From Swiss-Prot:
It is found in: Cytoplasm. This is Sulfur carrier protein TusA. The keyword Hydrolase does not apply. The active site is at C19. It holds the Pfam family TusA. PROSITE patterns: UPF0033. GO terms for molecular function: sulfur carrier activity. Keywords: Cytoplasm. The gene is tusA. GO terms for biological process: tRNA wobble position uridine thiolation. Sulfur carrier protein which probably makes part of a sulfur-relay system.
Length: 81
């Protein structure tokens, strides 16, 4: 796993959840974070490989890193302003 993931300030376990639940949980968690804070998301739903990058782009957050070659998938996002 990428070392960047170990620096996350928040963590969200979305294992076992299916679309649209992972993105709904990410949205709820990010709302409670301050701008610039980071969130590690761990998921196993294949739809997250599309949904999480799209969510970040749409909501102006930064997808810092992702590992999607095998499950569980890992995403590190930084909350935008």
């Amino acid at each position: 796993m990428n070392d960047a993931f170990s620096t996350a300030q928040h963590r969200l376990d979305a294992l076992g959840l299916r679309c649209p639940e992972p993105v709904m949980m990410v949205r709820k968690t990010v709302r409670q974070m301050a701008a610039g804070e980071t969130l590690l998301i761990i998921a196993d739903d294949p739809a997250t490989t599309r949904d999480i990058p799209s969510f970040c782009e749409f909501m102006d957050h930064t997808l810092i890193a992702s590992e999607t070659t095998q499950t569980p998938y890992h995403y590190l996002i930084k909350k935008g302003l």
